[in-house]
Amino acid sequence: MDLFQTLVLALVQGLTEFLPISSAAHLILVPELTDWDDQGLAFDVATHVGSLAAVVIYFRHELRRMTAEWLGSLAGRGLTPDAKLAWAVGLGTIPAGLAGLLFHDIIATHLRSAQVIAMATIGFAVLLLFADVSGKRTRDEHSITWKDVLVIGVAQALALIPGTSRSGITITAALLMGFTRQAAARYSFLLSIPIIALAGGFEILGLVKEPEENIQWGMIVLGALVAGVSAYLCIHYFLKLLAKMTMLPFVIYRLVLGAFLLFLFW
C-alpha cells in the first residue's frame, strides 16, 4: 500500500464515519474506481482507532461530566441529565450489539452486494429527508427519554445493513423523535463511541486469530493519524453547518451516489 492509497482510504474512513453518507458505499466505490488491492485488517483497525480517538477527544468535556454523573447515579445520588445521557449511550448500544452477534454471518453472506448497498444508500436517504422535513426539531440530547433510547437504538441496529449509514440512521431516528439537527448529531456521535470500540475489538480478535504478514507499520500509523484528524474536523464542521443548513445536501449526495453505484454494478 503506497502513500496516496493510505491517504485516500484514511480520509474516506475519517469522513464517512460521521457524515450521514454511508461509509460502505464509499468503501466499495473506491476500489472499483482505483483497482486497489484490499488494504488489510490491520489498516482497518488503525483507521477505526483514529476515528474513535477523534470523537473521544472532541467530546472529552461532555464525556468527563457524563462519566462523573453516571458514577454518581450508581452511588444513589440521583439521575441528572448527564447521568441519563450516559445511560442512554450505553443502553442505546445494546440493540446494535445484539443484532451484530445474531445476524453477522447472514449480513456478511447475503447483504454485502453492491446492489444492496446502492439501494440502502438511496432508500435511507429518502427517510432522512422525510425526518428532516417533518421533525419538530425542538429538543436537545439532555431531554432524551427511555423511549427515545429504544427507538434510536433499534434504528442503529439497521446500520448493520451495508449502505444504511450508522450516523445517518441514528440522526434520522432522532429527528423523527423531535431532536434538533445538532442534538441528533451529537447523540449519534456519542453513540458511535461504544460501537466503534466494539467493531475495532472484533477486528483485533480477527487479527489475533489470523495475523497479517509484512505489515507496513509506517502506513498503519499514518492511516490512524489521517483518519483521526479528518474525523475530528468532520465532527467539528458538520455540527457547525447543522446550525445553518438542512440535511438536503447530504440527501442529494446519497441519491446521486446510490444511482451511480446502481449504474456501475447492476
Swiss-Prot record:
Location in or out of the cell: Cell inner membrane
Transmembrane segments: 8-28, 39-59, 87-107, 113-133, 188-208, 219-239, 246-266
Family: Belongs to the UppP family.
Additional remarks: Bacitracin is thought to be involved in the inhibition of peptidoglycan synthesis by sequestering undecaprenyl diphosphate, thereby reducing the pool of lipid carrier available.
Function of the protein: Catalyzes the dephosphorylation of undecaprenyl diphosphate (UPP). Confers resistance to bacitracin.
UniProt catalytic activity: di-trans,octa-cis-undecaprenyl diphosphate + H2O = di-trans,octa-cis-undecaprenyl phosphate + phosphate + H(+)
Entry EC number(s): 3.6.1.27
PANTHER family for this protein: UNDECAPRENYL-DIPHOSPHATASE
Protein name stated in the entry: Undecaprenyl-diphosphatase
GO CC terms, sorted: plasma membrane
